[in-house]
Amino acid sequence: MGKLVVQGGAVLEGEVEISGSKNAALPIMAAAILCDEEVILKNVPRLQDVFVMIDILRSIGFRVEFEENELKIKRENDISQEVPYELVRKMRASFNVLGPIAVRTGRAKVALPGGCSIGVRPVDFHLEGLKKMGFSIKVEHGFVEACFERRIDYVTITLPFPSVGATEHLMTTAALLKGARVVIENAAMEPEIVDLQNFINRMGGHIEGAGTSRIVIEGVEKMQGVEYSIIPDRIEAGTYLVAIAASRGKGLVKNVNPDHLTNFFEKLEETGAKLKVLGNEVEIEMRERPKAVDVTTNPYPGFPTDLQPQMMAYLSTASGVSVITENVFKTRFLHVDELKRMGADIEVSGNVAIVKGVEKLSGAPVEGTDLRATAALLIAGIIADGVTEISNVEHIFRGYEDVIDKFSELGAKIEYVEKEN
């Protein structure tokens, strides 16, 4: 495990190309389990989480080839009903293979998931939904076993919270429940869910309503092979836009769907940043100290929780006091103590952080606690005086393709240093 050494003071300028969305690619890869024929996915980011999902698919009987950003998936052997613990523990999204395996084979056994440590993310919504769809569920010794027990004609599943993972898991599983009509109420509305619906429908599924709070799935008997391109990563796009603004630079962020970031754009403009949308490109310029703004995270289409840490790093040098309210992951403030080590003035009470802008941050040794927190510390290091060393940095490679090269091309001075034995 290495560290990132960041020389502060760079002004980011130039162009950056956004990769395909990790959060769209992973559930789409899980949905490929529904199909025996070859599935070709384009614009897939080369990230650690994607490689973990590839290993999972291979472990259960699929042939997977990954060249450049194109992924080919095809069932080669009988589908295994159990996924090795050492794979599932690495990544939360791996849990979403439980339903697809169970609906294909009648049974699945998967370990409780791992991934980012940003608070409790219970899988109860997934399991209660699967029960309503005719599966028996047994949780024992850290494993979940799902067995298909009874056919259903019609069921409505109302999620207590619009969970992205549960929405994706349940709609994917329901897609192959032949003859069943499954309605998900209070569904998550993220663009990645729309992408998943579009992919499954291209394979022959019958799903409508993704992007709204009510999704209706008509189960079919069989899926067919398809070629499909993953949407751009809106969180990666937002991260680079914040970084350019924080450094008081100017840049062009390419391969973006601006409709996916409306709320975020509004907040950036409130801080004084100048944005210009040019088709699937966004130009940003920020030459002055940002104005403080209040940010409240909410499920889509609200301000994304996955951009809250980066926004906090940006606002740490704003003029005035910003109030950041975290409504999605209540404990998503692990980056606060690290930013404070760099001179940020932040106080947390419950799910609210009060950010009093300071003139400058100072380089310091800090530790990445999760994927987006590490991105926030990288931004803080770029705008700080002096050198920042970020340890436990492997998180960032789970969510940002070619992150060092992309930031370096914008003018950041970043080096990855292997840990000495």
Swiss-Prot record:
Its main location: cytoplasm. It catalyses: phosphoenolpyruvate + UDP-N-acetyl-alpha-D-glucosamine = UDP-N-acetyl-3-O-(1-carboxyvinyl)-alpha-D-glucosamine + phosphate. Transmembrane segments: none annotated. GO terms for molecular function: UDP-N-acetylglucosamine 1-carboxyvinyltransferase activity. It comes from the Bacteria. HAMAP family: MurA. UDP-N-acetyl-alpha-D-glucosamine binds at R92, D306, V328. The keyword ATP-binding does not apply. Keywords: Cell cycle, Cell division, Cell shape, Cell wall biogenesis/degradation, Cytoplasm, Peptidoglycan synthesis, Pyruvate, Transferase. SUPFAM superfamilies: EPT/RTPC-like (SSF55205). Coiled coil: none annotated. The modification 2-(S-cysteinyl)pyruvic acid O-phosphothioketal is found at C116. GO terms for cellular component: cytoplasm. Phosphoenolpyruvate binds at K22, N23. This is UDP-N-acetylglucosamine 1-carboxyvinyltransferase.
